[in-house]
Amino acid sequence: SHRIEKPADTTICFEKGKVYNVGVLTLKSNDTVYIEEGAVVSGCVYADHCDNISIVGNGIINGACWHLPDSNADRFFIYAKWCNNVLLKGFTAVDGPSWHVVPAACDHVVIDDMNIMSRIVTGDGIDITSSQDVEVKNCFIRSTDDSICIKSQRLFEDPSTVRDVTKVRVHNNVIWNAEPGNAIELGYALQSEIHDLVFEDCDIIHCQYEGNMGGAAISIHQADGGHVHDIHYKNIRVEQAEQKLFDIKVLLCRYTEQLAKGEINDIYFDNIQVLNGDIPVSMIRGYQTPTEEVRVHDVHFDNITFMGNKCETWQDMRLVTELANDIYVNGARICRQMKF
């Protein structure tokens, strides 16, 4: 992280050379928290209906006090709900009790130059939940579950956290997805519309084998009723994908709350490079019951390369499709309709 000097408007300061046991640090509007390099803050940080809040600095927030060594706890680590103008910059968030950085139903959020490292299952890195106008950049994320995740769902039974997700840009991040989960994930809980998201110029250095529903470098898992469309992935380098490269599915699973399923369409992948390791499989699958059919459609793959070799066909990509229409590889439609 780049060195950050103490802001003039700092309201809460944690000084270097000290360990602070804060329990739950609750912020209010216009708070600026400065964590000096060499300071360790032990606890969680929450903000509810706040405007203009910042956590900056080069110190550490440690969440290990909130969970047993090998299990999670029923709380988030850094959690902002219904907040406006949020800045998280420079500090390291390590070993939280569950999801690590969670902006929920927030507007105008910047997450910049952070290090996020989790160790326990459900230790998601960043969960952008029902938020709009969000930028995530220059971060290193090593997570034992989804690394960067988009959701729209009730949190702790609060229906107010179900809202559209739009205007999200994720760029210039380094991602290590450890078992389980996915590296860049939309889902599973997508209960409102998800649209106009951009993921670009990121490095996925590891996406480890999961052996369950996830395990993809880039995934969209629609288990609910929100419409997912106009999602762009550009200039992403994958150093290791042990299970899957792309995984796009509409499905029923244990996370489902809405039985009527939302569509997935107008998804764009451009210049995605697998640099080494085994050649991973990719999957696109829609949803079908005796009374409902939802097909994934209009998915575009351009300039996908494995170890420098361009994939010209769906066979080159090791792409499997089911209940999918209008899938394109380098501009050529590979299927109108496929049934198994």
Language-model features, listed with the residues they occupy:
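Extracellular/periplasmic carbohydrate-active domains that bind, remodel
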Residues: 1-340
